[in-house]
C-alpha cells in the first residue's frame, strides 16, 4: 500500500513538473511579432523616459517584476488592487510603503493598449520593463520570453510567506529561491539588482546596529539617517549601493567584499559561506555577473506563467476585466 501511494505521488510530481515545463515552453521572444509588433518599442520608450526622469524608477520597475514572479508566478498579480473578494499583495509586509512604479506601469499599459488593445498582458509588460530598466541604467540586456497572461486574483498570504525578507540568513535565502526552482547562483546573481535602488531604515536598522559583519565606517554613515529606536525614521532611505547608486554595475559585490552590504541578507552572501567565491568572481569579473544576471532573469521570468487560455489579458493592470 505504501509503495502504491509513493508511486502515485511520484506520478503527480512528474505531471506537475511536466506542466510547468510546457507552460515555460509556450513563452517565446517573438510572441507579439504579429499580434502587436510595436509592443516592445512602445514599452522601451516609456521605460526609458521614466528612468530618465527619475533614475530610481528603474530599480522600482525591476523590483515589481521580482515581487510579481515570487508570488503565484509571473502573472501580474502584484499590480492588482484590493477587491471585495480578495486582498491584494501591495499591503504585504515586504511591499507596504515601499513597492512603487504603478503609475508608470499604468502609463505603459495605456500606450500599449492604444497600439493594440487587448493583446499584451500586464505580466509581460513587467518582464519587459524590468529588462529595459536595467539597460537604461547601463546594465545587460537579454531576450525576454513573452506570452504570459494575467491572473484574476492575488495572494496577500503568499506575498508575506514567499518574498525573501531582508533579515534572512544564507540558508533561508537559498531555501526561498530553491522553492521557486532557482539555484544558489541565481540567488547571488539576482541579488546584484541591489546595485541600484534604495532601502528603508526599518529594513537595515538591525544590520547596522547589531551585526558584527559590517564595516564600522559604513555603519556610522548609515546610522546618521537611521535612528536606533524602532518607529523613529523607519521610512528614511539609503542607497543599496553607495558607490554607484544609479548605475547597474558590479559594485554591489565589491561593497560586500568590504562589508558594506546595506541589508543583513546582502552581507550574508559574503560571510564565510558557500556563496563567498561567487561574490568574489562577480566583484572581479563584471562580464560574468552580467551574463549570469541575464540568465537568472530569464529563469525567474519562467516561474509558473499563465499561458494559453489561462487567466486573461487585463485591460487595466490594477483590476481584472
UniProtKB/Swiss-Prot annotation:
MF GO annotations: heme binding; lactoperoxidase activity; metal ion binding
Record EC number: 1.11.1.7
Listed GO biological process terms: hydrogen peroxide catabolic process; response to oxidative stress
InterPro entries tied to this protein: Haem_peroxidase (IPR002016), Haem_peroxidase_sf (IPR010255), Peroxidase_pln (IPR000823), Peroxidases_AS (IPR019794), Peroxidases_heam-ligand_BS (IPR019793), Secretory_peroxidase (IPR033905)
PROSITE patterns linked: PEROXIDASE_1 (PS00435), PEROXIDASE_2 (PS00436), PEROXIDASE_4 (PS50873)
Disulfide bonds: 36-116, 69-74, 122-317, 201-226
Glycosylation sites: 81, 172, 210
Compartments, record wording: Secreted
Binding-site list for Ca(2+) 1: 68, 71, 73, 75, 77
Key words of the record: Calcium, Disulfide bond, Glycoprotein, Heme, Hydrogen peroxide, Iron, Metal-binding, Oxidoreductase, Peroxidase, Pyrrolidone carboxylic acid, Secreted, Signal
Cofactor binding note from Swiss-Prot or TrEMBL: Binds 1 heme b (iron(II)-protoporphyrin IX) group per subunit. Binds 2 calcium ions per subunit.
Enzyme class: oxidoreductase
Family according to the record: Belongs to the peroxidase family. Classical plant (class III) peroxidase subfamily.
Protein name: Peroxidase 70
Gene name of the record: PER70
Amino acid at each position: 500500500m505504501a509503495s502504491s501511494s509513493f508511486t502515485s505521488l511520484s506520478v503527480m510530481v512528474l505531471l506537475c513538473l511536466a506542466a510547468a515545463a510546457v507552460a515555460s515552453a509556450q513563452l517565446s521572444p517573438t510572441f507579439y511579432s504579429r499580434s502587436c509588433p510595436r509592443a516592445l518599442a512602445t514599452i522601451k520608450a516609456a521605460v526609458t523616459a521614466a528612468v530618465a526622469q527619475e533614475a530610481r524608477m528603474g530599480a522600482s520597475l525591476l523590483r515589481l517584476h521580482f515581487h510579481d514572479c515570487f508570488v503565484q508566478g509571473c502573472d501580474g498579480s502584484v499590480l492588482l488592487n484590493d477587491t471585495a473578494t480578495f486582498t491584494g499583495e501591495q499591503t504585504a509586509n515586504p511591499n507596504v510603503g515601499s513597492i512603487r512604479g504603478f503609475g508608470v506601469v499604468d502609463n505603459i499599459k495605456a500606450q500599449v493598449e492604444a497600439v493594440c488593445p487587448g493583446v499584451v498582458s500586464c505580466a509581460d509588460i513587467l518582464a519587459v520593463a524590468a529588462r529595459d530598466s536595467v539597460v537604461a541604467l547601463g546594465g545587460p540586456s537579454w531576450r525576454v520570453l513573452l506570452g504570459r497572461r494575467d491572473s484574476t486574483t492575488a495572494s496577500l498570504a503568499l506575498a508575506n510567506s514567499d518574498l525573501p525578507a531582508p533579515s534572512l540568513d544564507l540558508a533561508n535565502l537559498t531555501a526561498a529561491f530553491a522553492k521557486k526552482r532557482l539555484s544558489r547562483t541565481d540567488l547571488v546573481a539576482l541579488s546584484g539588482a541591489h546595485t541600484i535602488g534604495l532601502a528603508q531604515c526599518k529594513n537595515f536598522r538591525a544590520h547596522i546596529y547589531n551585526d558584527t559583519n559590517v564595516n564600522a565606517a559604513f555603519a556610522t554613515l548609515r546610522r546618521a539617517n537611521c535612528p536606533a529606536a524602532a518607529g523613529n525614521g523607519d521610512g528614511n532611505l539609503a542607497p543599496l549601493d553607495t558607490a554607484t547608486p544609479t548605475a547597474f554595475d558590479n559594485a554591489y559585490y565589491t561593497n560586500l567584499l568590504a562589508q558594506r552590504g546595506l541589508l543583513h541578507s546582502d552581507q550574508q552572501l559574503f560571510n564565510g559561506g558557500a556563496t563567498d567565491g561567487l561574490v568574489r568572481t562577480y566583484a572581479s569579473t563584471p562580464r560574468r555577473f552580467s551574463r549570469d544576471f541575464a540568465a537568472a532573469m530569464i529563469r525567474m521570468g519562467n516561474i509558473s506563467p499563465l499561458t494559453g487560455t489561462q487567466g486573461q489579458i487585463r485591460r487595466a493592470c490594477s483590476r481584472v476585466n
